[in-house]
Amino acid sequence: MGVKGYTALIAAVTAERLVELVVSKRNLEWSKAYGGKEFGAGHYPAMVALHTGLLAGAALEARKRRFRPGLGWPMLGLVVAAQTLRWWCIKTLGPQWNTRVVVVPGATRVASGPYRVVPHPNYVAVVVEGVALPLVGGAWITSLVFSVVNAVLLRIRIRVENDALQSLT
């Protein structure tokens, strides 16, 4: 995969992320209509900045690297797997899925789909994508920096989400 192919991949993932934001906005409106309460809004801008940095950093760093098929193709497989898992989460949660942490009073905690196996499967997708997407293009610095900062933010995010989910019981 050359620079053009990798740039197309980053553009496709960026487009997918924009679709996610549209779905999230629609779901946020649904949640608010049913009395949804947002938790942990303070860390949301940092998450947006981090994910924007992932896409920009991977695209820029990959221009200085060369594609290594032994690494790049398996990482592309992981990117596809992560996207598949993410959309399985979105479909399973339906209107309760959001890029923000929002709980609707009276809603029940979803325990089907990937949530049967892992309490926070969307974050598994985020971690895998954050490692793999940059490595498709050999952008190991972006992969490393994203992974470290993401680990810090996920500690905060998962704590906030768990506290929010406790309010359902």
Predicted features, each with a name:
Residues 15-18, 49, 80, 117-118:
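Alpha-helical architecture
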Residues 3-14:
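Hydrophobic transmembrane alpha-helical segments in integral membrane proteins
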